[in-house]
Design a protein with these regions (language model features):
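N-terminal anchoring/stem segment of glycosyltransferases
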Residues: 1-78
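Glycine-rich loops and low-complexity Gly/Arg-rich segments
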Residues: 30, 71-74, 96, 112, ...
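Conserved donor-nucleotide/metal-binding helix-loop-beta segment in metal-dependent transferases, i.e.
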Residues: 111-137
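A conserved donor-nucleotide-binding helix/loop in the catalytic core
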Residues: 26-28, 33, 76-104
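Hydrophobic/aromatic beta-strand patches that form the interior of the parallel beta-sheet core
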Residues: 46-48, 103-105, 124-126
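Short loop/helix-cap segments at secondary-structure boundaries that form the rim of catalytic
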Residues: 56-61, 95, 113-121
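Short glycine/proline-enriched coil/turn segments at helix->beta-strand junctions
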Residues: 40-44, 97-102, 120-122
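The conserved acidic donor/metal-binding loop of glycosyltransferases
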Residues: 106-110
Length: 137
């Protein structure tokens, strides 16, 4: 099944206005493992991001990880979105850009085996729940 990662850099730049964009090495490793394991076990994957993220991945030679391409579609996100409060909004915009059925996969989620049997039938599925943190939400 088609999957996608997403990366919206605006929250990074809001928190770090004078820094060059970067991702911690361990996060790059989990991203690589996530994409490669998904491809091996479940199918194609793409990256939906913005231009700074695409340029960053290109500079590191990592675009090969996403066999279905790297698309800077998040450049069109409205400027009035509060990137501090809604730091994950890029995921929703990415989800709206990918035809269903699809899997929205966090870059730190590694799928070690096929999950096709879990995805046959339901209209929507979630691997896990996340607690709502009042200090964040």
């Amino acid at each position: 099944m088609q999957a996608f990662h997403s990366n919206w850099t605006r929250p990074f730049f809001i928190r770090n206005p004078h820094m060059e964009y970067r991702i911690e090495p361990f996060e790059l490793l989990t991203t690589a493992l996530s994409a490669l394991e998904w491809r091996r076990e479940n199918g194609s994957i793409r990256m939906i991001c913005d231009t700074p993220a695409k340029r960053y991945y290109e500079s590191l030679g990592l675009c090969f990880l996403w066999d279905d391409g790297v698309y800077p579609l998040l450049d069109t996100m409205p400027e009035d979105i509060n990137a501090t409060a809604f730091w994950a909004a890029g995921k929703l915009y990415a989800l709206s850009a990918v035809p269903s059925p699809c899997v929205m996969l966090d870059t730190d989620f590694i799928c070690w085996k096929s999950i096709s049997n879990l995805l046959d039938g339901p209209d929507t599925a979630a691997i896990h729940r996340e607690d709502i943190m009042p200090s964040i939400y």
